[in-house]
């Protein structure tokens, strides 16, 4: 073939601060159908119930050595900016996509730019109709709000939904989400 296969990769996030992942098996399947090769850290989605075998069955390459993933990939997608030791492995013309928080990580981003590494900070995407399908702020804020409501109901002293039973009706709880 005339073209090299582009490799997209993702590394384990710092699980103390980030439980989400960027590539679920469903997303990996989409990338592969587009002709991309996918590489992930071993146990990448384990904490969310995604086993390495689920990924391998789709054709995803699983690596124990994250530096090997970095060196051999074209695009790295992460939720947060990778750690300094991982960033130091990046080479010219690679691309990092994620929530890079460039205002707080200005020095790190500047260093990546000096190394000619492409950066796409999804948290800076304009909130316009054309970019709506990539608007991570709205989707994640929506998810956070949903989780906040569910978490708060654990402390609520009444039944939440309206319940109609043979014994009677319990009206729905009224809450204010701020």
Give the role of each language-model region.
Residues 1-5:
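Short, Lys/Arg-enriched N-terminal segments with co-localized hydrophobic residues
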Residues 7-9, 85-174:
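Glycine/serine-rich phosphate-binding loop and adjoining beta1-alpha1 elements at the start
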Residues 11, 177-178:
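Conserved N-terminal Rossmann-fold NAD(P)-binding element of oxidoreductases
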Residues 6-111, 115:
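An N-terminal-biased, well-structured beta-alpha scaffold segment characteristic
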